[in-house]
């Protein structure tokens, strides 16, 4: 008996690589993770998902602004930076990718988060829950070769350090955390978007940030308002006159 052509067809198992992060704001570290993601995919599909969380302290950028900045900063990955309001967590990313027909999945993350995600994602494989359902043949969590750039206290340039630079109005150091190809206009826009999300005013002068050396500990205490209390009596050294402290700092 002659078989039909369809009998010879073997359905190919679709495989995808992805990452998920806060990226608030995006940094050169996130770019390296995306480069690692593409490299490990070796021509297979890959996707970049970002958190939709927003707050003044750790997530100053809105979801839409973050997507815009990511696509501008990393044009070679722009098409892989996904906009999907239904994906708010890494687990929801798996649900979305499973519904898209993928059956093998690989998550690329900082090496310090491998165990966390490996446990979490495999725990719900084949389990119906509030987040939805997925049932992959394989779930692998792979190291991007470095620590998560979203982690607090990461060595080098991290999102937490970038937020600190924006809060302290230090554009010079903030710009050092961006890819060299990012132009000044886009860098300033990101800087001000972060400040705006923190409830701070927009910066227009972008003066160089200069840290002056400590002249004396006594002077530093005076500047910080730690040397005297309001109403204290002081003797002016040059004239020996007695004065009253009315302003601190």
Give the ranges of each region predicted by the language model.
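Nucleotidyltransferase catalytic core that binds NTPs
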Residues: 2-233, 238-244, 249
């Amino acid at each position: 008996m002659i078989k039909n052509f369809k009998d010879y067809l073997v359905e190919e198992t679709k495989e995808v690589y992805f990452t998920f992060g806060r990226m608030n704001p995006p940094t050169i570290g996130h770019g390296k993770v995306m480069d690692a993601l593409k490299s490990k995919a070796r021509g297979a599909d890959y996707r970049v998902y970002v958190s939709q969380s927003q707050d003044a302290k750790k997530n100053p950028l809105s979801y839409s602004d973050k997507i815009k900045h990511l696509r501008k900063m990393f044009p070679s990955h722009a098409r892989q930076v996904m906009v999907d309001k239904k994906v708010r967590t890494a687990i929801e990313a798996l649900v979305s990718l499973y519904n898209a027909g993928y059956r093998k999945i690989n998550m690329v993350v900082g090496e310090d988060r491998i165990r966390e995600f490996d446990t979490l994602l495999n725990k719900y494989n084949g389990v119906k829950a509030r987040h939805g359902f997925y049932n992959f043949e394989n779930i692998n969590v792979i190291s991007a070769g470095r620590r998560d750039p979203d982690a607090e206290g990461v060595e080098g340039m991290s999102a937490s350090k970038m937020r600190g630079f924006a809060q302290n109005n230090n554009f010079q150091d903030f710009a050092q955390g961006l890819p060299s190809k990012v132009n000044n206009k886009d860098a300033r826009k990101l800087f001000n978007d972060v400040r705006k999300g923190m409830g701070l005013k927009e910066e227009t002068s972008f003066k160089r940030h200069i840290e002056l050396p400590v002249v004396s500990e006594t002077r530093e205490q005076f500047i910080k308002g730690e040397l005297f209390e309001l109403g204290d009596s002081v003797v002016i050294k040059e004239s020996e006159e007695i004065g009253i402290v009315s302003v601190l700092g």
